[in-house]
Amino acid sequence: MSYTSSQEVRLGQRPDASDAPLYNATIAEAFTRYWKRYATFSGRASRSEYWWMALISLAVAIGTTSIDVVTNGSFAEARTTATGVGDLLSYAWGLAAIVPTVALGVRRLHDTNRSGNWIFLGLVPFIGVIVLLIFYLAPSNPAGVRFDRASGG
């Protein structure tokens, strides 16, 4: 199967369809798109979309842990009790973010022309997570367009 230039979104362009990856996304664009595509498992996500959200999630984890340390007095105590404000915020973020995070991971796999079923590799201890990390770091593959929904009905 060959791909014409009209079927591909070039790097640096903003896609017309919501299924197309947003290359060179800013942190604000990645965050907005993450929540707008909350449970969308079709389509693709660029590396920048994926890694900006990974950075935001890391920042939330650091922030909620910091709140726990400040309110509990020490890091060790903050990690042994699950009753602090930081814990509640962490649980709220985790519950709100689980579905869009999995959906984003599936779309990122699609952008590398891999089936979303590879996401289950993350359930394999150590090796599975490392392999997924390599997949998420992989460059976009134009053949991943096959995971976009057909336009026009």
Provide a role label for each language-model segment.
Residues 65-68, 101, 122, 132-136:
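Structural signal for membrane-spanning alpha-helices in multi-pass inner-membrane proteins
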Residues 119-128:
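Short hydrophobic membrane-inserting alpha-helices and related fusion/pore-forming segments
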Residues 2, 61-98:
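Membrane-helix interface segments in multi-pass membrane proteins
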Residues 26, 30, 58, 87-91, ...:
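Extracytoplasmic/secreted proteins, especially bacterial periplasmic and envelope-associated proteins
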Residues 42-43, 78-81, 111, 121-122:
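Helix-boundary and loop/linker segments of multi-pass membrane transporters
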Residues 49, 53, 87-94, 119, ...:
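Residue-level signature of transmembrane alpha-helical entry/exit and packing/kink sites
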Residues 61, 92, 96-103, 127-134:
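Alpha-helical transmembrane segments
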Residues 2-56, 103-117, 134-153:
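Membrane-interface extramembranous regions at the lipid-water interface
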